[in-house]
A protein has these predicted regions:
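A detector for short, charged/polar N-terminal pre-domain segments
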Residues: 1-8
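Short basic helix-loop element that most often maps to the first helix and adjoining turn
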Residues: 11-26, 30
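DNA major-groove recognition helix of helix-turn-helix/homeodomain DNA-binding modules
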Residues: 51-66
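A generic secondary-structure micro-motif detector
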Residues: 3, 14, 42-43
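Recognition helix of helix-turn-helix/homeodomain-like DNA-binding domains
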Residues: 32-46
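Short, conserved catalytic or interaction motifs in soluble domains
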Residues: 43, 68-69
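Residue-level recognition of specific faces of alpha-helices
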Residues: 12, 26, 37-40, 53
Length: 69
């Protein structure tokens, strides 16, 4: 999947979380972030902190790869 916007990241996180049958509360606790932060992330809010986003992605088994194409 190509990520171009914060909405793309949010959608990927939400879809993956649901596929893993995790609630927002469970994933937030696992990632040591607040549920409000996770909700904002899943809704594409552009002011999210990248470190927290990466923690959440790691706990979902996702990785971020950057290419210079």
């Amino acid at each position: 999947m190509i990520i171009r916007t914060t909405e793309d990241i949010g959608n990927l996180v939400k879809i993956t979380r649901k596929n893993l049958k995790l609630t927002q509360v469970q994933l937030a606790q696992l990632s040591n972030v607040g549920t409000r932060f996770l909700s904002d992330l899943e809704n594409g809010k552009s002011t999210c902190e990248i470190e927290k986003v990466l923690k959440i992605m790691l706990n979902l088994g996702l990785k971020l790869e950057v290419n210079n194409d």
